[in-house]
Swiss-Prot record:
The lineage of its organism: Viruses, Riboviria, Orthornavirae, Negarnaviricota, Polyploviricotina. RNA-dependent RNA polymerase which is responsible for replication and transcription of virus RNA segments. The transcription of viral mRNAs occurs by a unique mechanism called cap-snatching. 5' methylated caps of cellular mRNAs are cleaved after 10-13 nucleotides by PA. In turn, these short capped RNAs are used as primers by PB1 for transcription of viral mRNAs. During virus replication, PB1 initiates RNA synthesis and copy vRNA into complementary RNA (cRNA) which in turn serves as a template for the production of more vRNAs. Its main location: host cell. Keywords: Eukaryotic host gene expression shutoff by virus, Eukaryotic host transcription shutoff by virus, Host cytoplasm, Host gene expression shutoff by virus, Host nucleus, Host-virus interaction, Inhibition of host RNA polymerase II by virus, Nucleotide-binding, Nucleotidyltransferase, Phosphoprotein, RNA-directed RNA polymerase, Transferase, Viral RNA replication, Viral transcription. It comes from Influenza A virus (strain A/Turkey/Ontario/7732/1966 H5N9). InterPro entries: RNA-dir_pol_NSvirus, RNA_pol_PB1_influenza. Influenza RNA polymerase is composed of three subunits: PB1, PB2 and PA. Interacts (via N-terminus) with PA (via C-terminus). Interacts (via C-terminus) with PB2 (via N-terminus); this interaction is essential for transcription initiation. Belongs to the influenza viruses polymerase PB1 family. This is RNA-directed RNA polymerase catalytic subunit. GO terms for cellular component: host cell cytoplasm; host cell nucleus. The gene is PB1.
């Protein structure tokens, strides 16, 4: 029978069918090989957009720098980065005029944060450029290495544990004539294996001291390492993203704290909120524009797209914004906040791994590291790569490219949103002084513009004025990729608005399925995803029921735990059948032990163990959840865990799910092969941190643990805490006198050891 596919949509409103056109099923594309080419593209493009600016040379590093600020006003529609300082400052002034006290209050909030933030804030985040080893590392390790090097160079302000004091060290480190660092290297040697008598290669890890002069250190401190952005759907070309080092991160964090605080107070800002809260906020702006456009006015909405947002933004402009926003604040605060944009004006982009060459005979492969691109003969490269290298050569220093203009992806999302909103804010009638007026929504580089006017000419004039105003601050609305509609239908940050936001369900598709953490977590995450989508994304009861059945099927195939009475043969079926036969109450078996599925859409909020507890045989209960059973993982004490789920766009989201510790919540062991590589030292460091932090948490259960604002080390804090707790326990009779004396003695010993050290 032939089915005409359009028949499927007869009963579906057009806006609900939008989901079906999204490229969100299946695996997203990943990048392979080196990101060097993409990074060179970014650097070259950024310079092209600002090419009419002024060239200068950085006196400290010798890097050539291009400054497009207050450059020529554009005469065509090509994207450009020539922001005008006075225009940006005026936009800020108007923003403050229409939101009295907004900057003042945000500064006060930020000042409090600056004084209280601990340096461990920087351990959050994934890969970070580690300047000591000149490559990426997990954030915690990169921070540890930085602090270790600082201490060995006599910079010790960071020992207070406050982020602001760590940043003092960073500032001082930049004035030092030289910095001594410890680098890791590998030695390979051939030795004869005693057992097999064969020759084997033995690797040993060495650490060696190395001195960096001021120039080399500054280049590293200002370096952003680059990688290729993975898993981007709906694009043919990959693009580069940057990861900054520890020197820059802390300063950026404070700037973004200030900008976040401002964004929270701006009704047009799509950041920092998300999800349903964001939808409600945005729907308000639309409602305002629609109710104000009485019968006499037309209202149109542009679904906006900006050309190369990051590459046309300029850190110097951000410096001007910060200078204005903080103008009545204490000097120290203004200084702390202006350092991030200054560092970004002098940033260097690391070109990544370099290029891989293969000989025609495919017998030889060789890596050309980025450092060699400045001097290598270009005859080995194809045309497009040759052009890239020729263009970037004047900018190269030690394998990094000087990149003064532009912002790199995702660094100042909040602050750039403030800039965008300040232009939307200029659309009020009292500022446009004509019949048209505008408002809109801004979230990083994404925007929606709502224009109201008495007639079509007015709408056109309003759009033109908005377009030109944006050009003055380095924002380039793309005329090709933006489109206009009667207000009531538009798209913003992948939310589709059609007289209210429509659920774009396809975006959630990638997060359905089995996560692959362990049997316990996967079951919990799977049902939580379905539950959340019923709440937030119009997942109807029938579809949810079907999703649940598909999930259980998927789960059983993943963990080979088909029901005990099934005919399917897997390598687990023998054990599971045996368990099935000797279990009296078969309904009590977990799905992962071959039991039946008791979930339906009404009880998705209950962890499976709790759902089946009353139905379980006693000895099964005893095995499953017995803390004395060595297979029961009790790593997590809280009852709520966090899983990382991948929505189709945007960063991975953290999602809470209920965690019940059972024999099924195992933690896979680390791959052993890492222990033979140069990463081994890092791993040991990481485990040491883990142990220290776990110990610290034992002393300060989260309920009583307020972040210390004073200055004391972790050890001192734990010792004083132990003394207080011991005294309370002794006085209330929970511990004996001897135990109390022993605890006090241990505490004194620890303090004595610290003094000797």
């Amino acid at each position: 029978m032939d089915v005409n596919p359009t028949l499927l949509f007869l009963k579906v409103p057009a806006q609900n069918a939008i989901s079906t056109t999204f490229p969100y099923t299946g695996d997203p594309p990943y990048s392979h090989g080196t990101g060097t080419g993409y990074t060179m593209d970014t650097v070259n493009r950024t310079h092209q957009y600002s090419e009419k600016g002024k060239w200068t040379t950085n006196t400290e590093t010798g890097a050539p720098q291009l400054n497009p600020i207050d450059g020529p006003l554009p005469e065509d529609n090509e994207p450009s980065g020539y922001a005008q300082t006075d225009c940006v400052l005026e936009a800020m002034a108007f923003l403050e005029e229409s939101h009295p006290g907004i900057f003042e209050n945000s500064c006060l909030e930020t000042m409090e944060v600056v004084q209280q933030t601990r340096v461990d804030k920087l351990t959050q985040g994934r890969q970070t450029y580690d300047w000591t080893l000149n490559r990426n590392q997990p954030a915690a390790t990169a921070l540890a290495n930085t602090i270790e090097v600082f201490r060995s160079n006599g910079l010790t302000a960071n020992e207070s544990g406050r982020l602001i004091d760590f940043l003092k060290d960073v500032m001082e480190s930049m004035d030092k004539e030289e910095m001594e660092i410890t680098t890791h290297f590998q030695r390979k040697r051939r030795v004869r294996d005693n057992m097999t008598k064969k020759m084997v290669t033995q690797r040993t890890i060495g650490k060696k001291k190395q001195k960096l002069n001021k120039r080399s250190y500054l280049i590293r401190a200002l370096t952003l390492n680059t990688m290729t952005k993975d898993a981007e759907r709906g694009k043919l070309k990959r693009r580069a993203i940057a990861t900054p080092g520890m020197q820059i991160r802390g300063f950026v964090y404070f700037v973004e704290t200030l900008a976040r605080s401002i964004c929270e107070k701006l009704e047009q800002s799509g950041l920092p909120v998300g999800g349903n809260e964001k939808k409600a906020k945005l729907a308000n702006v639309v409602r305002k524009m629609m109710t104000n456009s009485q019968d006499t006015e037309l209202s149109f909405t542009i679904t906006g797209d900006n050309t190369k947002w990051n590459e046309n933004q300029n850190p110097r402009m951000f410096l001007a914004m910060i200078t204005y926003i903080t103008r009545n604040q204490p000097e120290w605060f203004r200084n702390v906040l202006s350092i991030a944009p200054i560092m970004f004006s002098n940033k260097m982009a690391r070109l990544g791994k370099g290029y891989m060459f293969e000989s025609k005979g495919m017998k030889l492969r060789t890596q050309i590291p980025a450092e060699m691109l400045a001097s290598i003969d270009l005859k080995y490269f194809n045309d497009s790569t040759r052009k890239k290298i020729e263009k970037i050569r004047p900018l190269l220093i030690d394998g990094t490219a000087s990149l003064s203009p532009g912002m790199m992806m995702g660094m100042f999302n909040m602050l750039s949103t403030v800039l965008g909103v300040s232009i939307l804010n200029l659309g009020q009638k009292r500022y446009t002084k004509t019949t048209y007026w505008w408002d809109g929504l801004q979230s990083s580089d994404d925007f929606a513009l709502i224009v109201n006017a008495p007639n079509h000419e007015g709408i056109q004039a309003g759009v033109d004025r908005f377009y030109r105003t944006c050009k003055l601050v380095g924002i380039n609305m793309s005329k090709k990729k933006s489109y206009i509609n009667r207000t009531g239908t538009f798209e913003f940050t992948s939310f589709f608005y059609r007289y209210g936001f429509v659920a774009n369900f396809s975006m959630e598709l990638p997060s359905f399925g089995v996560s692959g953490i362990n049997e316990s977590a996967d079951m919990s995450i799977g049902v939580t995803v379905i539950k959340n989508n019923m709440i937030n994304n119009d997942l109807g009861p029938a579809t949810a029921q079907m999703a649940l059945q598909l999930f259980i099927k998927d789960y059983r195939y993943t963990y080979r735990c088909h029901r005990g009475d099934t005919q399917i043969q897997t390598r687990r079926s023998f054990e599971l059948k045996k368990l099935w036969e000797q279990t009296r109450s078969k309904a009590g078996l977990l799905v992962s032990d071959g039991g039946p599925n008791l979930y339906n859409i009404r009880n998705l909020h209950i962890p499976e163990v709790c759902l089946k507890w009353e139905l379980m045989d006693e000895d099964y209960q005893g095995r499953l959840c017995n803390p004395l059973n060595p297979f029961v993982s009790h790593k997590e004490i809280e009852s709520v865990n966090n899983a990382v789920v991948m929505p189709a766009h945007g960063p991975a989201k953290s999602m809470e799910y209920d965690a019940v510790a059972t024999t099924h919540s195992w933690i896979p062991k680390r791959n052993r092969s890492i222990l033979n590589t140069s990463q081994r030292g890092i791993l040991e460091d990481e485990q040491m941190y883990q142990k220290c932090c776990n110990l610290f948490e034992k002393f300060f259960p989260s309920s009583s643990y307020r972040r210390p604002v004073g200055i004391s080390s972790m050890v001192e804090a734990m010792v004083s805490r132990a003394r207080i707790d011991a005294r309370i326990d002794f006085e209330s009779g929970r511990i004996k006198k001897e135990e109390f004396a022993e605890i006090m003695k241990i505490c004194s010993t620890i303090e004595e050891l610290r003094r000797q050290k």
